[in-house]
């Protein structure tokens, strides 16, 4: 029996596997129903709130004809003191085909993989990693740059905002750097991690040299204290506005949820250069490909 194929971080995949997943995802764009996962059962267990990721995974599974069981954490035995380890062991005893988990603690999926015999797919763990978000972002970039990952080499992407608290940033930094993009981190000092990457405190200073803007939400739920004067003060420096984009050939990404007029201006969200909804569409296709990869290969 082969060991389960987990996806806990982007580094679990080599470049060839990533390219295979993206190619497979693109084949799903015009196909809304396949039977690749018929008679498979997938459990989703989210200890943090989610709109896009949870819905995207469940739609992806159902489009592949899998049965989906959503564990309602608020009604589960974890509220009675059952440990994560025991929860995982009990779920595993039901022989699911995969478990998709989101948790506030970094490394939760890594810990659970030793308790189960099926694939664990990380849907976000604390500020650590969000591999499927990075994969869907990579697909969005691939499609924009003439559907060729080689065209990403040398392109500059500014990741803007609450980087130190962002699992999306961590996963994208690892993945996009691997495919040759130059990553620039743009944020106030207290939002920047210790890094070897180029950093900048001013969005306007680097706006004219980048090809891609990736804005991030300010994750106030991960802040121990107020660390900026106000969201209005923050937006005055880091909100993506029509003035910042100007008439340049750039695109805008955001993992959602978007804080309108704080992360991205209303007018920019309506601009065709803003690819936020394309990211959401790509998310379903990428997660279909990830589920098939982890369960069937």
From Swiss-Prot:
Residue sites binding carbamoyl phosphate per the record: 52-53, 102, 130, 133, 256-257
Keywords: Pyrimidine biosynthesis, Transferase
Catalytic activity: carbamoyl phosphate + L-aspartate = N-carbamoyl-L-aspartate + phosphate + H(+)
Enzyme's top EC category: transferase
EC numbers for this chain: 2.1.3.2
Keyword Translocase assigned: no
Any one GO BP annotation for this protein: 'de novo' UMP biosynthetic process
Any one Gene Ontology cellular component term annotated for this protein: cytosol
Pathway recorded for this protein: Pyrimidine metabolism; UMP biosynthesis via de novo pathway; (S)-dihydroorotate from bicarbonate: step 2/3
Binding site for L-aspartate: 80, 167, 217
A single GO molecular function term of this UniProt record: amino acid binding
Family of the protein in this entry: Belongs to the aspartate/ornithine carbamoyltransferase superfamily. ATCase family.
Entry-linked NCBIfam families: asp_carb_tr, PRK00856.1
Quaternary structure annotation from Swiss-Prot or TrEMBL: Heterododecamer (2C3:3R2) of six catalytic PyrB chains organized as two trimers (C3), and six regulatory PyrI chains organized as three dimers (R2).
Alphabetical list of PANTHER family matching this protein: ASPARTATE CARBAMOYLTRANSFERASE (PTHR45753:SF6), ORNITHINE CARBAMOYLTRANSFERASE, MITOCHONDRIAL (PTHR45753)
Protein name from the UniProt record: Aspartate carbamoyltransferase catalytic subunit
């Amino acid at each position: 029996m082969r060991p389960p194929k987990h996806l806990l971080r982007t580094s679990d995949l080599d470049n060839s596997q990533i390219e295979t997943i993206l190619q497979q995802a693109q084949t799903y764009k015009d196909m809304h129903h396949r039977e690749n996962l018929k008679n498979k059962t997938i459990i989703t267990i989210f200890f943090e709130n989610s709109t896009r990721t949870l819905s995207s995974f469940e739609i992806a599974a159902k489009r592949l004809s899998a049965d989906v069981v959503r564990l309602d954490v608020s009604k589960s035995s974890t509220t009675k003191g059952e440990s994560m380890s025991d929860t995982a062991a009990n779920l595993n005893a039901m022989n699911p085909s995969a478990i998709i988990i989101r948790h506030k603690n970094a490394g939760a999926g890594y810990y659970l993989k030793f308790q189960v015999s099926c694939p664990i797919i990380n849907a976000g763990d604390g500020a650590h990693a969000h591999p499927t978000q990075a994969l869907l972002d990579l697909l969005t970039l691939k499609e924009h740059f003439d559907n060729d990952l080689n065209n990403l080499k040398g392109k500059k992407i500014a990741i803007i905002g609450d980087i130190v608290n962002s699992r999306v940033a961590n996963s994208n930094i690892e993945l996009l750097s691997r495919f040759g993009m130059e990553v620039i981190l743009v944020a106030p000092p207290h939002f920047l991690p210790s890094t070897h990457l180029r950093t900048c405190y001013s969005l306007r200073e680097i706006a004219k040299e980048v090809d891609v803007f990736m804005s991030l939400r300010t994750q106030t739920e991960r802040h121990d204290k107020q660390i900026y004067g106000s969201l209005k003060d923050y937006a005055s420096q880091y909100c993506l506005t029509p003035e910042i984009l100007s008439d340049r050939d750039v695109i805008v990404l955001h993992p959602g949820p978007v804080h309108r007029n704080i992360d991205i201006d209303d007018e920019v969200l309506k601009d065709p250069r803003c690819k936020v909804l394309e990211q959401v569409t790509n998310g379903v296709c990428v997660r279909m490909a990830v589920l098939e990869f982890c369960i069937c290969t």
